[in-house]
Amino acid sequence: MTSILLVAHDSPYGSERLYNALRIALATQEHAETPVSQKLFLMSDATVAALSGQQTPDLSYHIGQMLEILLAQGVEIAVCRTCAEARGLSQDRLIEGITIGTLVDLTRHTLAADKVIHI
């Protein structure tokens, strides 16, 4: 089984970088010919994407729903603890199933992954 680690850094709205990263993750889950193990690690401003109860005014895309779909597909999602704390985020404010991880966790995932993508 191929393992992929996707590390995202940009805020969920205002730029489409995180949106496109999640589109890649969704497409990989849905169209891979062989089983794929994916992990998503949100850092910097991307951590706020994990907030539960998001409402998008224009309904063009909903990052929270995309994360929930990935969780339902078995993708492990974590946010950087240091980055989350700097933004006032705690576990109880995150979408159910998303965890808070550390740099050590990210390092382990990086060393174990067949492919690492930073977006």
What residue spans do the PLM features occupy?
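Nucleotide donor/acceptor-binding cores
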Residues: T2
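Short, glycine-rich nucleotide/cofactor-binding loops
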Residues: L5-A21, A50-Q55
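C-terminal structural segments of small proteins and small subunits
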Residues: A86-I119
